């Protein structure tokens, strides 16, 4: 990217989203918006989009990308667990079952706003209490929607993913890259 271009402002505190965008070669400036993520009475997919929009609108800049990921178990949102016990409960509920992961993004360019929601279906394998205790003990799931990270130790919990794996991680990278590229914002 030419030196005269502004950076891509990531309206997210997610180290995973930042790392994904940096892996593509984009210079990133993180601006964590002060947006409350709890309490919106919306269905899971609509909630992901509303939160991404709120985050994006809360940050100034020419090129702004915000995203939010929501884990949807039979229409119920499983957010970030409050503590290890709630993480344990989430994993027990997900064990041996499929669920949906909705990742929404809000991309503001100098000329337009693009908003999309991408969904993947995740299948957990049946988990023993010992496996759940091992994963909860790692602490990895405490800052992640649904209480697990598919790209880290949580990969051991998954049977398979239908759809884009990066949607589960927190950003449909290929789609975001294509949108930025088509608008002349290149690494």
From Swiss-Prot:
Task: Please tell me which top-level EC class this enzyme sits in.
Answer: hydrolase
Which keywords appear in this protein's UniProt record, sorted alphabetically? Cytoplasm, Hydrolase, Nucleotide metabolism
Keyword Ribosomal protein in annotation: no
GO MF: dTTP diphosphatase activity; UTP diphosphatase activity
Example GO CC term: the record gives: cytoplasm
One Pfam family assigned to this protein is Maf
| Subcellular localization(s) per the UniProt record | Cytoplasm
Which domain of life does the UniProt lineage start with? Bacteria
Q: Which InterPro entries match?
A: ITPase-like_fam, Maf-like
- Name the catalysed reactions: dTTP + H2O = dTMP + diphosphate + H(+); UTP + H2O = UMP + diphosphate + H(+)
UniProt site (Important for substrate specificity)? 16, 69, 151
Q: Which family does it belong to?
A: Belongs to the Maf family. YhdE subfamily.
Listed name of the protein: dTTP/UTP pyrophosphatase
Query: Which species is the source of this protein?
Result: Thermus thermophilus (strain ATCC BAA-163 / DSM 7039 / HB27)
């Amino acid at each position: 990217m030419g030196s005269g271009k502004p950076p891509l402002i990531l309206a997210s505190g997610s180290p995973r989203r930042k790392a994904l965008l940096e892996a593509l070669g984009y210079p990133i400036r993180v601006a964590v918006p002060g947006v409350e993520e709890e309490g919106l009475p919306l269905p899971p997919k609509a909630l992901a989009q509303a939160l991404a929009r709120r985050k994006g609108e809360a940050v100034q800049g020419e090129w702004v990308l915000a995203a939010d990921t929501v884990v949807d178990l039979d229409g119920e949102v499983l957010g970030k667990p409050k503590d290890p016990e709630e993480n344990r409960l989430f994993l027990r509920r997900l064990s041996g079952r499929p669920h949906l992961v909705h990742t929404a993004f809000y991309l503001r360019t100098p000329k337009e706003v693009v908003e999309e929601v991408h969904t993947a279906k995740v299948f957990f394998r049946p988990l023993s209490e010992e496996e759940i205790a091992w994963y909860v003990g790692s602490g990895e799931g405490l800052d992640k929607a649904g209480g697990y990270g598919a790209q880290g130790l949580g990969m051991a919990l998954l049977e398979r993913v239908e759809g884009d794996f990066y949607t589960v991680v927190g950003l449909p990278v290929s789609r975001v890259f294509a949108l930025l590229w088509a608008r002349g914002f290149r690494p």
